[in-house]
């Protein structure tokens, strides 16, 4: 069993996680924040089970990303980046052509796509094209209406 303790505050504020995050079967998802891909890669390389939250770095080196084989990546955070639109955008805005092409690369390498933070349109695009889909940290619209929470139709797609 794996625990996904990728609290953004832990990876964003201090720049370093406690040692136990690197020694156990805990997924260490590195949040992009203001750091470069090179800096994020340094954190992720220490992890036993690396992942990335918002992999839309301008300096993204796809070969380096594939080298460490993250369990999953989120393509966006709440906003827009090179791959698509996050949940801050209208539901009809989804993945950009570069995002769709990137999913093909992730599929070829067995890396899951995390649909947390993505727009409703992006969610549809991910479901249609990604071979492995996860949702690492989102709640349910039926419990609390929020732009990031999943609607019932999305839960059906994930099930």
Question: Where in this protein do the model-derived segments appear?
Answer:
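Loop-centered beta-sheet repeat module
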Residues: 92-127, 133-138
């Amino acid at each position: 069993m794996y625990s996904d303790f990728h609290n953004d505050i832990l990876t964003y504020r201090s720049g370093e996680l406690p040692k136990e995050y690197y020694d156990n079967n805990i997924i260490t998802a590195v949040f992009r924040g203001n750091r470069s891909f090179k800096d994020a890669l340094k954190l992720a390389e220490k992890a036993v089970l690396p992942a990335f939250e918002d992999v839309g770095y301008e300096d993204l080196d796809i070969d380096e990303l594939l080298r460490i084989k993250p369990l999953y990546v989120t393509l966006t955070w709440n906003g827009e980046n090179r791959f698509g639109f996050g949940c801050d955008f209208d539901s009809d805005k989804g993945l950009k052509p570069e995002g769709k092409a990137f999913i093909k690369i992730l599929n070829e390498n067995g890396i899951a796509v995390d649909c947390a933070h993505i727009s409703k349109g992006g969610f549809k695009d991910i479901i249609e094209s990604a071979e492995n889909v996860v949702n690492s940290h989102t709640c349910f619209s039926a419990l609390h209406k929020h732009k990031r929470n999943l609607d019932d139709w999305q839960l059906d797609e994930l099930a």
